[in-house]
Amino acid sequence: MFDGARLAQGLPYYISQVVFYPFEIYNSMSIVDVISRQDELDSPKAKPHVNATVFDSWWFDAVSNNLTKESITVVFYNAGPESIGAPDLGGPLFVEISGTFDNGTKFTIGSTAPEGAVIESGTQGIRGDWMGSGCSFTGSDLHRPSPEYTVSIDNAGLGVFGKLTLQSVSPPHFAGGSNKPGVSPELIPNIYAAFAQPDAAAVVDFTINGKTLKFNGVGHHEKNWGTAALEASVKAWYWGHGRVGPYSLVWFDGVTPGGKEYFASLITENGKIVSQSCEPNSVVVRPWGENDEFPPVRGAAAPAGYTLRYALGHGMAFVANFTREVSQVEADTYKRMIGSFSGGMEGGEQYEGRALCDQFQF
């Protein structure tokens, strides 16, 4: 099929790579991409495979638009046993499915991919299959308007069946800039991110152990990878995404074990970029209420919420507030939360919305 849209942008018609990862660790040096390449925003970053300290993952989530407690997060991992702190499952390939039902009840279930993983990616999009897990995902060309991703799960052993569909609201970008070659994806030293869908319209339709999880909401898809153990690279971080009125927001405020703070921020309005930066203090995130210690320490409970302040330059700022309603995941070193979200230009109209965020604390 002739693809005039891509050719008009000076992009190649069709280039694809297919990678197979076995359910075993690579016992040598992994070569990891640390600068963006053409048409590879969502492609695998570790070659030929992950070793013990390298990880490569694809994250998808959604939180209900309504004032309900429904949410879901699905993460496809290719992670060495010393990389993200997860239990050693006998191999690096696994899928984690977490969420909350309307009544606030949370669940976390998962499956390994003992038959390996196949990932095909290129100019037409991406397809990933964690074989033996019943979990897969597809995504369309990120250079086209409103890319769409679908996560499909069919696993009788887990009792999970259904789909998550995400239609982009905001354009793709890296932590350090837009979706083009030569951009740094670094969030914090050794840890990288590519936001294929910073904000998306989500449609969720799952059956989980006989219970229905079905809603429309605010969605997000990003890719994360790292070249060293997470705990060796991060003391704490605050990350999240949300939507208020016409604005879509992504934030990252992280601290290294040495105490240096790193930032990454994005604001779009009706799909157009208002601000994108990884400059110091581009988005300052701080906890409020109980458990407002900064940075948070291992074992501390989740805070009541966060304040966010985006520096836009010329004395302008975008301010937002997240209020935790329910925790999707709780551990000594990690919290994932959903809740209400409000914000707008400082001194201007303030809007209401929804958000999902997480917190590391080592």
Curated annotation (Swiss-Prot):
Q: Which gene encodes it?
A: penF
Q: What happens when the gene is disrupted?
A: Abolishes the production of penigequinolone and accumulates the epoxide formed by penE.
Q: Could you tell me what reaction this enzyme catalyses?
A: [(1'E)-5'-(3',3'-dimethyloxiran-2'-yl)-3'-hydroxy-3'-methylpent-1'-en-1'-yl]-quinolinone B = yaequinolone D
Signal sequence bounds: none
MF terms per GO, please?
lyase activity; metal ion binding
What the record says about family reads: Belongs to the quinolone epoxide rearrangement protein penF family.
What UniProt keywords apply to this chain's record, in alphabetical order?
Copper, Lyase, Metal-binding
Which residues does the entry assign to the active site, renumbered to this chain? 220, 222 (broensted acid)
Q: In which pathway does it act?
A: Secondary metabolite biosynthesis; Alkaloid biosynthesis; Mycotoxin biosynthesis
Q: Mind telling me what this protein is named?
A: Quinolone epoxide rearrangement protein penF
UniProt effect for mutating residue 222 to A/D: Greatly decreases the activity toward dienyl epoxide and results in only trace amounts of product
Q: What does this protein do?
A: Quinolone epoxide rearrangement protein; part of the gene cluster that mediates the biosynthesis of penigequinolones, potent insecticidal alkaloids that contain a highly modified 10-carbon prenyl group. The first stage is catalyzed by the nonribosomal peptide synthetase penN that condenses anthranilic acid and O-methyl-L-tyrosine to produce 4'-methoxycyclopeptin. 4'-methoxycyclopeptin is then converted to 4'-methoxydehydrocyclopeptin by the ketoglutarate-dependent dioxygenase penM through dehydrogenation to form a double bond between C-alpha and C-beta of the O-methyltyrosine side chain.
- Reported effect of changing residue 220 to A? Completely abolishes the activity
Against Pfam families, the record matches this protein to:
DA_N
EC number(s) on file: 4.2.1.-
